[in-house]
From Swiss-Prot:
Protein's name in the database: Transcription elongation factor GreA
Gene3D superfamilies listed in its UniProt record: Transcription elongation factor, GreA/GreB, C-terminal domain (3.10.50.30), Transcription elongation factor, GreA/GreB, N-terminal domain (1.10.287.180)
Coiled coil: 46-71
Species in which this protein is naturally found: Syntrophus aciditrophicus (strain SB)
Summary of the function given for this chain in its UniProt record: Necessary for efficient RNA polymerase transcription elongation past template-encoded arresting sites. The arresting sites in DNA have the property of trapping a certain fraction of elongating RNA polymerases that pass through, resulting in locked ternary complexes. Cleavage of the nascent transcript by cleavage factors such as GreA or GreB allows the resumption of elongation from the new 3'terminus. GreA releases sequences of 2 to 3 nucleotides.
Lineage of the organism: Bacteria, Pseudomonadati, Thermodesulfobacteriota, Syntrophia, Syntrophales
Similarity annotation: Belongs to the GreA/GreB family.
Keywords: Coiled coil, DNA-binding, Transcription, Transcription regulation
Gene Ontology molecular functions: DNA binding; RNA polymerase binding
GO terms of biological process kind: DNA-templated transcription elongation; regulation of DNA-templated transcription elongation
Amino acid sequence: MEKMPITKSGFENLKKELEHLKCVLIPANIKDIEIARAHGDLSENAEYTAAKEKQSFLHGKLQELENNLALSNVIDLKMLSDDRIVFGATVIIEEASTGKQTNYQLVGPFESNISENKISVTSPIGKALIGKSIGDEVKVHTPGGIRNFEVVDIYINPSEL
């Protein structure tokens, strides 16, 4: 499979999430199953059924995290320039129709989170921004139509270095 870019902090967050899953959530679920099993008849034991469903979910999440870590390619942001938008850069863009400015960090698909203004380089807006410079106009095709932006600033966040 193809390696996916990820920031150092994104990679560390995935590792912490995996560790929490292995050391806290899965052991707690094992105890829940044991307690529910002790209640007797498993065929009509809702507690047991719920704990087994959670076990399945947790093991699916475990596989997903292990796969994501294996496919991760940590990019050293210290080596990046801030004259063009590249993976890891934080950009400030201004929407032409409203004048509203928004900042986004371009990250890999494993760490994108719109509530943290982290968008994937594979998203429509991420693809449109890659390679642009300050002052460039950017057209983004969205389900709601074409949106026009101007690149106001590009920088590498010092906390990511």
